[in-house]
């Protein structure tokens, strides 16, 4: 068992490297979301993609442009075909494992856990007697007309409704009617700067917080970096809406 500790440390170092990379990517996309908030475009056809690359992005940007999508968004793009029946995502001739959009723009697929699709809710409000009903389920909320509802939101899977100026919780399950899959298009190197000190410190301790008594060792990792927006014209965020069936 002499190499057991070394094997464990090798595994931990590999795990830390993987997590720090994921953290950087998540922060970069968080900044991208902030830069594009309220300016998202709808991606529903091949033409809508061409609108982004032909008109939405400056020609100087498209030369270094790429596409980033989560698994759901990638899957939606991967099913699109042109008028000749060819898929718009094709392997890079020089790197067969890399896919290209329109044969020009590399596309990167990231995990749905890292970049989540946004759920869309479309509650139907009706009046049942003197009570408000949501999606056919009668609530305890007094209402005489659907116009009494001025706002709603979803909290922990349930609808919270503002009716007659009062915010009230309900027991009605919020049903997802669709998902918006995010697609980032442009040159991230021009849009965002990663200030990376390339310094990761790892501290190990087996005596803190009762670790000694439990025969455990604690690990603390410090990673110093920052992400800042540079050019909001270098990136466009699109949403692919997928309707939930049933």
Predicted feature descriptions by range:
Residues 37-134, 140, 150-225, 245:
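Extended oligomerization regions of viral-like shell subunits
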Residues 1-40, 211-246:
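Flexible, glycine/threonine- and acidic-rich loop/arm segments that mediate assembly and lattice contacts
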Residues 145-146:
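Short acidic/polar hinge/loop motifs at secondary-structure boundaries
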